[in-house]
């Protein structure tokens, strides 16, 4: 998901997506520890996507004050 797509989401949608992505990230980490993934860089990509979403949420929070 690109930053432009993240910015188009409403705050409520963004919060829901962050929760879903964190759950998916945790599940990938658990699965990877049990049996190695074919593409372990997916974990890194997921972590960075979560960071982008949280950064956008924080920017919105600061702009509203």
Swiss-Prot record:
Organism superkingdom: Bacteria
Q: Which NCBIfam families match?
A: L29
Keywords on this record? Ribonucleoprotein, Ribosomal protein
Q: Look up and give the organism this protein is from.
A: Parabacteroides distasonis (strain ATCC 8503 / DSM 20701 / CIP 104284 / JCM 5825 / NCTC 11152)
Annotated InterPro entries:
Ribosomal_uL29, Ribosomal_uL29_sf
Query: What terms describe the molecular function in GO for this protein?
Result: structural constituent of ribosome
Which GO CC terms are listed, alphabetically?
A: ribonucleoprotein complex; ribosome
Q: Does the keyword Ribonucleoprotein apply?
A: yes
Ranges that cross the membrane? none
Record-stated family: Belongs to the universal ribosomal protein uL29 family.
- Listed GO biological process terms: translation
This chain belongs to the protein called Large ribosomal subunit protein uL29
